[in-house]
Structures are given as C-alpha cells and as structure tokens.
Amino acid sequence: MKTVFFDIDSQRDFLYPAGALYVPHAERIVPAIARRNRLAAAHGIPVLSTTDAHAEDDPEFSVWPPHCVAGTWGQHKAQATLVDGRITIPNRACDIALEGAPQIVVEKQTVDIFLAPNLARVVERLDADRYVVYGVVTEICVLYAVRGLLKTGKPVTVVTDAVAALTAEASARALEGIRAGGGRLATVSEIGVT
C-alpha cells in the first residue's frame, strides 16, 4: 500500500508568533510535522507539502491580512519541516519532474489546494493508496485538502495532534466534518510509516 504524507502550509507566517497570520499555539505542532516528514523520507514515503505563495496585491487579502507573500520570511516553510532533496513546483502551469524527490512542495494562492495549477497532476502522478494529512489551518486549508483527497476514493487520515486551528470550536467542527465525510482521525502515535 503506497502512502503519501500531506503537509499543509507549514509556513512561518502561520506557525510562529512573529508571523503575519499566526495561528494560536501552532508552533507546538512543528516538532510533530518535522518528525512525520523526516520519518516519511527515511522510509521512502513521499511528502507532498503545500505553501501559500501570494502576490503583494493578492485578492485573498480582502478576506485575510497579507501573509505568505512570495519571497518573504513568512512565506517560507518552517526549516524543521523541510526534507533534503526536495523540489518546489511553482504556482503556474509547468513541467513536473517528481522522480526521486522525497518532498514535493507545491505553491498555491488559494485556500483550496486543488485550485493550484499543478496539484491534481502531482496527486495523480504520486498514485497513492492512502493519504496522511497534517498542518494548518485545520478548518480551512486542511479541510479543503481532505475534502479534495476524499474525492479520489482513497483513505485519508488526519493527524489530530499535528494540526492547528484558529479556534478550538472551529477545529472540533472541521474534524467532525472530516470524520462524518469518511476521513479517519488519528494521533501521531497511531500513525505508522507504511
């Protein structure tokens, strides 16, 4: 069974208090994300990571404060979540070469990761039998990712102690919606590497 670990938006602007759109207490999940990513790479499990990469005048800033502007400190993934040998796929249509990359970082500009021009092709090329999802924000990008992945008909597990939300109530609603929609919920200790 081929597993893909899916690391959603583990970027400085979301994870750290100095970030432009800090998610309360999100820095607490950085070690869990880092361990998941390193463990996956050590066992040959692909890590598919997403990152916001906004323009300075991005339309999303009418809803949210400016954050993850391409090239800024806050747009970069937390260093601990990076895997050596990674590749980055920009937020524009392009050729994709995934062979041998332990971590594939896909840039996006919207909360729905499946609107990124390359994500569906990457998911198709990885041809997973199941997905393990973690990152930020539980009730926004993580939820969109899980909904999109569930449409593939493959099992999706959310690692509940490796996600962070804006509020506990929003997190509980999102996780219940994921479970009710066919997703599985598990903790870091319950997730194997195969």
PLM feature spans:
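A short glycine-rich beta-strand->turn/loop micro-motif centered on a GG-aromatic cluster
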Residues: 132-135, 154-168
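Active-site flanking residues adjacent to catalytic metal/cofactor-binding acidic residues
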Residues: 6-8, 51, 160
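Short glycine-enriched, charge-decorated loop/helix-capping segments at active-site entrances
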Residues: 18-26, 63-68
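Short, glycine/acidic-enriched loop or turn micro-motifs at the edges of active sites
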Residues: 12, 55, 164
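Extreme N-terminal starter segment of soluble prokaryotic enzymes
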Residues: 1-5
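Histidine-anchored nucleotide/phosphate-binding helix
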Residues: 35-39, 140-151
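Active-site alpha/beta core segments
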Residues: 31-130
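A charged, well-structured terminal subsegment
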Residues: 88, 185-194
